[in-house]
Amino acid sequence: MPRNENPIEKTESFGHVVKVQQVIDFMVLSDLMGGQRYHSEMEQFITQTFNGVGVNDAYFSNRLKALFEAGHVTRHWDGDNRYNRFYRITDSGMEYFKLMLREMPERVKRAKRVYDSFDSYIEKFGKMNLK
């Protein structure tokens, strides 16, 4: 195959599209701005906000752990029940949230453009005879 003499210039990369972890982090921190929340409350908040689309429980737990390890949230147990863990946002979490609040609107717009283009591309194959 001959080398492309006129390559298309890449103006952006997929790394600049919204990532699932950023959506979860944003939703968790925004919810915690209203006060402490339990793991299950935040999970329900996300599912409700996205009209029934939720987060895999193990992935959600890993994101909460990552936010804790980064110092963006604190976590405590309510009594002896290890499942009654509640979280609070920290000053570092507020700064991270402010950063995301500045960056996310453009990332979401970019993601919409990418997904619209991908949707159009997929439609081409729906019209093909793939026998």
Where in this protein do the model-derived segments appear?
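Basic amphipathic alpha-helical segments that dock to polyanions
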Residues: F60-L67
